[in-house]
Structure formats: structure tokens, C-alpha cells
Amino acid sequence: MIELRDYQKKAVRELKQKMIDMLNDSEDRQKLIFKAPTGAGKTVMVSTLLDELTRDLPMNGQCRYSRVAWVWIAPNKLHQQSYRSMRNFFSERRSLRPVMFDECDHVDGLHPGDVLFLNWESINKDNAVMIRDNEQNRTLYELIRKTKIEQHLPVVVIIDEEHMFAGRNAKKSEMVLQAIQPHIELRVSATPVTQSYHAVLVKRQDVINEEMIKKGIELNPNVKSSKEQSELTVNQRLLKKALDKRKEL
């Protein structure tokens, strides 16, 4: 386990309370936005959230659910990165069991503490192996159905880098999520595109204060706009600065 920074602890607390409130709501496909700047440790914070909820819900009198099934969807190869990170972060506690599709229990569905990691590109096509029907009936949608019916678990989907599911991917993303029908969608991004009443924000300055990321670097700070230079482009100003320096030498 790693020690969380103060802003990370605060974000996890807020996410946890909002998640419990939303689990108590009977509506499906509720959206919880988690906005944090790049470098803030979003994977660590979300993993900690899942760990704490998995351990605390069975003893929590506030929530109508004592167990939850988790599905973590990420673009490109980020799901593998998050999968490995979670295995490393929580290897001692063993409250969470990160799994890939082939490692799941396809007879009874996802179990409490299972976190299914999926690559977005592997499920966003009609002929994708995880989606299309087969003789063994081993599909993502059948796995989710069994999780809900056999295990009686609500499904929470973590959408990592949520902004990448928008634009030309928006229609297909909606079709997949509509088929999964999660109870909650935790949408994680530095630049989220979805709007929701439920949101947790990590301020960039708080991350900078903890020295997790640095302030923006000002390139060529001595190149200032002035009345004389106002009509010049940036490149022209840089060139003029270089020529002036050359004359000095």
C-alpha cells in the first residue's frame, strides 16, 4: 500500500460518500464525475475508493448494498496499466481481485471484490469476441447478466479517460453502456465531457502544493510583448531576441 496525499484522501472521502448515496438510489446509469489533473494519481485514488467500499460496505448501515461488482473500462492499453497498478497497490490487503475477461467466473458472474478490466477497443465493435454470441455463451453481456441475477450485485463501471469515449466514439460508447446498464458510471478524466450533478474535483493547485506535479514552465520568459514588438509574431520576436544577443557577443 502507498500513503495517500491529503488531497487524495479528501477526494476518496468525497467519492465514497457520493457513491454510497447513489447506491441507495434505485435509478440505473447514474453518473459520477471525477475530475483530476494529469499526474494527480487518479488510478491510485479510484483503486483506493474501490478497496475502501469493498471492505466497508458489509459493515455500513447507510447503504442498501453490502457488495458491488466493478468493471473498469479504459482506452488503448491503459486497462493493462491500471490492472498491474491495482495488483501492486493492493496485493497485501487482497480485498480487490483485479481480473481480465478470461479469468472471470463465467458460470456465476463477477464476485464481490472482482474488478474486471476491459480494453475499450475490444468491446466497441459488433464482431468483437467479448460481445458476439458463441457456443459457450461467454460474452461480456452474459457475464454482467449473471452478476446481477446470480450474485445479486449492482454493477459500477469506471470509465477511465472519459473524454476519449466522446466525439466519434460517443454513439458506440452509449450502446455498450446501455447494454451493460450499470447502476453507477464513475467517469474519470482530467478533462471530462459529461455533465452531472454528482461530481468530485481535485484542484490543480492542491496537486502542485503536494509537489506531485510542477507549475507550468514559461518558455523564453524574457521575450515580452511591448509597444515596439506588438506587431511581431512570436517567431519574429524570438529571432529578434537572438540577433540582439548575437550583437552583444
Question: Which residues fall in each region the model found?
Answer:
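Inter-Walker segment of RecA-like/P-loop motor cores
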Residues: S91-T139
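Post-DEXD/H (motif II) to motif III coupling segment of the RecA-like Helicase ATP-binding lobe
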Residues: G167-G216
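Conserved Walker A/P-loop ATP-binding site and its immediately adjacent core
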Residues: T43-T48, P58-R94, N119-S122
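Walker A/P-loop
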Residues: D25-L49
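Conserved interdomain linker/interface between the two RecA-like ATPase lobes of SF2 helicase motors
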Residues: S196-L249
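Conserved nucleotide-binding/hydrolysis micro-motifs of P-loop NTPases
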Residues: N76-H79, E121-N124, H163-M164, T191-Q195, ...
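N-terminal pre-P-loop "Q-motif" helix
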Residues: I2-D28, N119
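SF2 helicase catalytic motif II
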Residues: S122-I184
